[in-house]
Structure formats: C-alpha cells, structure tokens
C-alpha cells in the first residue's frame, strides 16, 4: 500500500477524534462545576449545623446531617464519573496511537519489500551488463592478439593510456590533469597490471585528480568525482579521511 493510502486511511479514522475529545472534556468540566456547587452547599449546611446545633431538635439535626451526607455521596459519584471519562478519553487516544504504530510498521515492511525487489532487479540487470562487457572484452582481446608482436616491442609505459601530469598550482595545492578522459573509457583501455591504484575507489588514475595536502596521507591522489569536486578548490585541500583526523586533533 502506498504511503498516501496509509495516511488517507489514518486521517479518516481520526476525523471525529477532535469532536469526541471536546465532548469528553466539556463533560468533565460540567462535573467539576457541579462538584464545586455541592461543596458550597455542604459548607453552608455544615455552618448552619454548627451555629444552631444547640437550638435544633434531634430530628432537625439528623435532617441536616443527612443532607450533608447525601451531598458528599453525590460528590463521590461525580468524581467517579469524571475518572471514567478520563479513562475513556485516554483509551480513545491510545487506540489511535496504536493504529498509527501498526500502519507505520506495515509501511516500513512495504518499503523493505520494495527495496529487496529493486535490489534483485539491479542484480539481474548488472549481470546482463557484465555478460555484455565480457563479450566486448573477448573481442578486444582478439583484436589485441593480432598486434601482439608490436605490443611486445613497445615499453610498458606506452601501454598506459593515461599519464599523470603534475601542474604548477597557483596556491601550492597538488593537482593532476589527464585531459578529457571519462571513467567509462578506462574500462576499454589496456592497463599495466602493475599500475598503482589511487583514491577511495582503489582504481587507476583517470580524469581529473587532486592531491591531498597532508604529507602523511596514505592515498595521496583522488578522483574529482569520488570526493565531490567539480573544480579545483582554492588553497589547501585535505581528503575526507585526513579532514576527519584533523577535526579529532
């Protein structure tokens, strides 16, 4: 079920909740007011009894005491009714909270299921691409085998289609340029198996790269795309790992 459907159903279920809460709160306020009125009546009866107890007959005393007792009984009833209303209001809100928790759990389960389906689709798609790339590599290998003799005579350095060229940066920042080379082109280029790898991606050098200004950096060189750069920054630049280490210090 889509997120919009879960939200729509939940909003429908709580549509009358504000009115029900308002009604219960109003009833509790009414009970409070009636209790206060009874307490005032009890105070009046108690004062009357204390002030005229000596002049009243036994029957009159009993009548006043009975009125006070009945008023206290009604106060207790109003208090019990208020407690019941408060419990009903709490259960009403709690029911909707539990409904929301259940819908959220179902929504999260649906999201996980869709992520698994998407992952399976991506996996099967990548297998197809890998198979196509393998066939392409076989064709390239056959083409290279035709010129094997000439390749063997060429020095290893000539097999690298990419060559690091250090520039003289304006701000003393190490920088590397490789011309207009794209990562997709690197897959088709014959690379010396002994060629060193760089960057967080552990790939060979290609495209625009930048050097970390930390002399103790274990990686040193990074592809622009891998560290989120599009242009050479001004001043000194430190890689993500070295930046974290500098912050800790």
From Swiss-Prot:
Citrullination by PADI4 within the nuclear localization signal disrupts the interaction with p53 and increases susceptibility to degradation. It is found in: Nucleus. Keywords: Acetylation, Apoptosis, Cell cycle, Chromatin regulator, Citrullination, Coiled coil, Metal-binding, Nucleus, Tumor suppressor, Zinc, Zinc-finger. GO terms for biological process: apoptotic process; DNA replication-dependent chromatin disassembly; negative regulation of cell population proliferation; negative regulation of DNA-templated transcription; negative regulation of growth; positive regulation of apoptotic process; positive regulation of DNA damage response, signal transduction by p53 class mediator; regulation of cell cycle. The modification Citrulline is found at residues 133, 166. One of its GO terms (cellular component) is nucleus. Zn(2+) 2 binds at residues 212, 217, 239, 242. Belongs to the ING family. Homodimer. Component of the HBO1 complex composed of KAT7/HBO1, MEAF6, ING4 or ING5, and one scaffold subunit: complexes containing BRPF scaffold (BRPF1, BRD1/BRPF2 or BRPF3) direct KAT7/HBO1 specificity towards H3K14ac, while complexes containing JADE scaffold (JADE1, JADE2 and JADE3) mediate acetylation of histone H4. Interacts with H3K4me3 and to a lesser extent with H3K4me2, the interaction augments KAT7/HBO1 acetylation activity on H3 tails. Interacts with EP300, RELA and TP53; these interactions may be indirect. Interacts with EGLN1. Isoform 2, isoform 3, isoform 4 and isoform 5 are expressed in the mammary gland, ovary, spleen and muscle. The keyword Metal-binding applies. It comes from Mus musculus. Residues 25-118 form a coiled coil. This is Inhibitor of growth protein 4. A zinc finger (PHD-type) spans 196-245. Zn(2+) 1 binds at residues 199, 201, 223, 226. Component of HBO1 complexes, which specifically mediate acetylation of histone H3 at 'Lys-14' (H3K14ac), and have reduced activity toward histone H4. Through chromatin acetylation it may function in DNA replication. May inhibit tumor progression by modulating the transcriptional output of signaling pathways which regulate cell proliferation. Can suppress brain tumor angiogenesis through transcriptional repression of RELA/NFKB3 target genes when complexed with RELA. May also specifically suppress loss of contact inhibition elicited by activated oncogenes such as MYC. The PHD-type zinc finger mediates the binding to H3K4me3. The N-terminal coiled-coil domain mediates homodimerization. The record marks 198, 209, 213, 221 as: Histone H3K4me3 binding. Residues 115-163 are annotated as: Disordered.
């Amino acid at each position: 079920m889509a997120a919009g459907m879960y939200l729509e159903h939940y909003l429908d279920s709580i549509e009358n909740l504000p009115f029900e809460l308002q009604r219960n709160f109003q009833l509790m306020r009414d009970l409070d007011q009636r209790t206060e009125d009874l307490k005032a009546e009890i105070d009046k009866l108690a004062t009357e009894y204390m002030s005229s107890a000596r002049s009243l007959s036994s029957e009159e005393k009993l009548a006043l005491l009975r009125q006070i007792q009945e008023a206290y009984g009604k106060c207790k009833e109003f208090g019990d009714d208020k407690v019941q209303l408060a419990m009903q209001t709490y259960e009403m809100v709690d029911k909707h909270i539990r409904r929301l928790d259940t819908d959220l759990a179902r929504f999260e389960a649906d999201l996980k299921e869709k992520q698994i389906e998407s992952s399976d689709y991506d996996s099967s798609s990548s297998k197809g691409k890998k198979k196509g790339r393998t066939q392409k590599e076989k064709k390239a290998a056959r083409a290279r085998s035709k010129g094997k003799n000439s390749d063997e005579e060429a020095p290893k350095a000539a097999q690298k289609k990419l060559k690091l060229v250090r520039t003289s940066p304006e701000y003393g920042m190490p920088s590397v340029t490789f011309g207009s080379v794209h990562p997709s082109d690197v897959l088709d280029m014959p690379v010396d198996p002994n060629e060193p790898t760089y960057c967080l991606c552990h790939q060979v050098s290609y495209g625009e790269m930048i050097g970390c200004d930390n002399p103790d950096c274990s990686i040193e060189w990074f592809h622009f795309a891998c560290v989120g750069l599009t242009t050479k920054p001004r001043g000194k630049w430190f890689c993500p790992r070295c930046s974290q280490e500098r912050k800790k210090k």
